[in-house]
Regions:
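Interhelical loop/hinge segments that connect adjacent transmembrane helices in multipass membrane
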Residues: 1-4, 116-117, 177-183, 195-240, ...
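Signature of the first transmembrane helix
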Residues: 2-65, 93-101, 128, 224-254
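Membrane-interface junctions at transmembrane-helix termini in multi-pass inner-membrane proteins
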Residues: 5, 67, 131-154, 344-376, ...
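Transmembrane helical elements of multi-pass membrane transporters/channels
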Residues: 7-23, 183-199, 215-286, 306, ...
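Helix-loop junctions and terminal segments of transmembrane helices
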Residues: 57-73, 144, 262-304, 308-311, ...
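Interfacial segments at transmembrane-helix termini and the short loops linking adjacent helices
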Residues: 104-125, 309, 318-348, 354
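Hydrophobic alpha-helical transmembrane segments
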Residues: 153-169, 173-203, 374-379, 393-414, ...
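Membrane-proximal transmembrane or re-entrant/amphipathic helices at the cytosolic face
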Residues: 444-487
Length: 487
């Protein structure tokens, strides 16, 4: 089993643990302990900070993935590459402080909300942005050192444990909501601090003047890559977080809270994608440099098949149990039912692409991926403006699904006609049809009235059996087994 598979499995293990913890926090504890407005506030802080942190990074993560192998030399302190990261992010964060200082009132405005929560806690956007920026930059730097799992472990597992402890402290009146927000912000510092410590322990945390010869040779292209990754990263953050911001603008914090809780359930479909890309990026860049196209095609096929297989399984598993989901989440949040469906569908569309997006990003056509992503961000904003006033929070989710479908189609077209990668496979048709057929078979089996927990377990067992049998019947499973053996 290769490095991608090992790191992906380790990362996925912590991701799944994080999903369990996140599900307990978001679906069970948050709705029962916090008000909808308070949940909305937390998610607005996260959304704004993620967007600002991505902008403040000034594209350095793209530069790290694309160029670090030219600097890699531990005996020479990686030719001062960490100093480049520090300088670039320092300039970016200073720019954020200036923009937020001048326009914070306009940024936090809402047409529908008279709540004072945002104005009371707007100062927290600054430290949350700083800790988020530190994490996303150090996480990528650690990944190119072969330490991709530590970030996943800290962010998806340790931070969520800390979050659970804090929300329980709030429940038992050991702290107030103001204390919760303060300690929540401090907890966000844990992942970057631990990554820093691990990098220091391994000798990767050293500062020196960047190597002038390497910069002279690659500096111009590094600036170009960084510039395009600013647009790409900003587009990605718009796609991921702008819906919460726009729901707050049109509908208020309460609607943002409901959307955020149900959105989390829909994002479970993307779990198979999360850990794979981080460790694969530097490897794909190397394969392009060596022009190993056959190996790149094989990586695309295995990543796409495995992600789609697991993504479809999670999607149909959620939707067959949707009534049980709203036994876990309070019924007050049932207006977000179709948010779960459309967000799940949006993430399922991206599973079709596998590592195809990263194949474009790490190729000489990286600029096109940037324009595709920026186009996606623009399309998400436009469709949110159209759909939210008409359909409410379900409109925001529908906007994401529609936009990501267009995005995936454009990426597949480019993979085929520009990179010579065959994007559509037999499995891309069989796996979704197998999932739909499995769902239909379970749906039309008459079941007697029973407790919702028993029904959830029974539905899950049935969907697993039918899905597994049909996958084996259509000979999809052997391909996935090969993926885990050889990737």
């Amino acid at each position: 089993m290769g490095i991608i598979a090992r790191q992906t499995i380790k990362g996925s293990f912590y991701s799944y643990l994080g999903v369990v913890l996140g599900g307990i926090n978001v679906a069970i504890l948050y709705p029962r302990i916090l008000t909808e407005d308070q949940i909305g506030l937390i998610n607005i802080l996260i959304a704004l900070s993620a967007i600002f942190a991505q902008f403040s990074s000034l594209g350095i993560n793209g530069v790290t993935n694309y160029f670090f192998h030219y600097f890699r030399d531990l005996t020479r302190r990686h030719h001062g590459y960490l100093s480049i990261i520090a300088i670039v992010t320092g300039i970016g964060f200073a720019g954020f402080l200036l923009i937020y200082g001048l326009f914070s009132e306009q940024i936090l405005s809402s047409r529908a909300d008279n709540s004072t929560l945002l104005s009371d806690y707007n100062i927290y956007v600054i430290p949350v942005t700083f800790f988020t920026l530190a994490f996303i930059v150090l996480d990528v730097y650690a990944a190119v050192q072969g330490k991709s799992v530590i970030g996943t472990f800290m962010k998806d597992f340790v931070f969520r444990i800390a979050n659970m402890v804090l929300i329980l402290c709030l429940y038992f009146d050991l702290i107030g909501f103001a204390d919760f927000i303060f300690l929540y912000t401090l907890a966000l510092a844990l992942p970057p601090v631990v990554i820093l410590a691990e990098l220091g322990r391994k000798g990767h945390l050293t500062l020196k003047a960047p190597d002038a010869d390497i910069l002279k040779k690659h500096g111009k292209k590094m600036k170009s890559v960084g510039g395009y990754h600013i647009l790409a990263g900003f587009g990605n953050m718009l796609v991921t977080y702008i819906d919460r911001y726009m729901i707050n603008f049109f509908l208020g914090l309460g609607a943002t809270g409901i959307y955020s809780v149900t959105n989390y359930v829909g994002t479970l479909v993307q779990i198979p994608r999360r850990s794979m890309g981080k460790i694969a990026t530097p490897m794909l860049a190397r394969l392009w440099a060596e022009n190993k196209r056959e190996e790149l095609q094989n990586i695309y096929e295995r990543s796409s098949i495995s992600q789609l297989l697991l993504g479809v399984y999670i999607f149909i598993g959620i939707w067959i149990n949707i009534d049980a989901v709203f036994k876990i989440i309070p019924r007050d949040y049932e207006s977000g039912k179709w948010v779960i469906f459309y967000i799940g569908l949006a993430n399922l569309f991206q599973c079709f692409l596998g590592l195809g997006g990263l194949l474009i990003t790490t190729s000489r056509y990286y600029k096109m991926r940037t324009w595709f992503t920026f186009m996606l961000g623009f399309l998400v904003v436009l469709t949110n403006i159209i759909f939210i006033p008409i359909l409410g929070i379900a409109g925001a989710a529908m906007a994401s699904a529609f936009s990501k479908l267009i995005f995936v189609v454009f990426n597949m077209w480019f993979l085929h006609f520009k990179l010579g990668i065959v994007p559509l496979l037999r499995e891309h048709v069989i796996i979704p049809l197998t999932g739909a057929l499995s769902y239909g078979l379970v749906l039309f089996i008459p079941l007697p009235a029973m407790h919702w927990v028993i029904e959830l377990v029974l539905n899950s067992i049935l969907i697993t059996i039918f899905y597994g049998i049909l996958l084996r019947t259509f000979r999809v499973v052997p391909n996935v087994k090969q993926f885990f053996r050889s990737f």
